[in-house]
């Protein structure tokens, strides 16, 4: 029966390969010791499927699997080195891809594992996750700590949660400004200069205006320079400094991943019911 379902799943998956799957959910998992964690996006065609128990269980199991088994890439097609997530075996004994095929056969929609992020720390630090709106937005955050014992302090635990919420709400692209590549900076500056010139400003003035707008760009896109969502009088960097001072231990944001369900994917606009029937 299992072999038949696998074969049926392959056939169903092939039949639905051309459909658009831009709905779905983000799931996360962090190990009890907070030393490793994962963020996963699994897509389907309609929001209805995100409420199906089998789909939700698979998406959640997959996040734990990624954290524990440490795949390097989705598949060989990515061009990156393995191990590959879709080829790895789950607790059921089926591979991730076989499980996807089985879900496609039983649910009747195209289902895809789109992407994942995995963080792990061996040095003092902490992995924090945050899922917003039932899986529409997910965040994974890595923090470095000067003193390992500070990881159990309430002030630090609250900070980790608040920073993850900050990433979810404010959509930063970088931790700090030195992470912004030169090409991006050059493009942004060129746009700002062109805008100022189009507004009738002389070139010398346009250059200064562009520099000011570049500062605004940093404040919007760099996490440490953003205004803290819970206190407009603080930047995230100042918040870090305050909590670090209270704890007597340095804190550093190492990296983060922020996934928003279906971002960058084409949306369905056709008659889904008609297609299924």
Cite the ranges covered by each PLM segment.
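N-terminal assembly/interaction segments in proteins that build large macromolecular machines
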Residues: 1-277
């Amino acid at each position: 029966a299992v072999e038949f379902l696998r074969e049926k799943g392959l056939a169903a998956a092939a039949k639905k390969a051309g459909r658009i799957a831009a709905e779905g959910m983000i799931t996360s998992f962090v190990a009890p010791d907070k030393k490793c964690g994962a963020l996963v996006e699994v897509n389907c065609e309609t929001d209805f499927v995100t409420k199906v128990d089998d789909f939700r269980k698979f998406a959640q199991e997959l996040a734990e699997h990624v954290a524990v088994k440490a795949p390097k890439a989705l598949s060989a097609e990515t061009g990156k080195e393995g191990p590959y997530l879709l080829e790895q075996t789950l607790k059921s004994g089926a591979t991730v891809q076989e499980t996807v095929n089985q879900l496609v056969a039983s649910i009747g929609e195209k289902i895809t594992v789109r992407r994942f992020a995995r963080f792990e720390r061996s040095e003092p630090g902490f992995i924090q996750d945050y899922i917003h709106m039932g899986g529409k937005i997910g965040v994974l955050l890595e923090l470095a700590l000067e003193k390992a014992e500070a990881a159990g302090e309430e002030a630090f635990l609250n900070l980790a949660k608040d920073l993850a919420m900050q990433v979810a709400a404010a959509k930063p692209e970088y931790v700090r400004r030195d992470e912004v590549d030169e090409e991006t900076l050059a493009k942004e500056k060129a746009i700002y200069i062109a805008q100022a010139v189009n507004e009738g400003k002389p070139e010398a003035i346009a250059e200064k205006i562009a520099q000011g707008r570049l500062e605004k760009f940093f404040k919007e896109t760099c996490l440490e320079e953003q205004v803290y969502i819970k206190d407009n009088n603080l930047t995230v960097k100042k918040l870090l400094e305050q909590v670090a001072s209270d704890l007597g231990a340095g804190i550093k944001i190492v990296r983060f991943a922020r996934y928003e369900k279906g971002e960058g994917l084409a949306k369905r606009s056709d008659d889904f019911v008609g297609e299924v029937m």
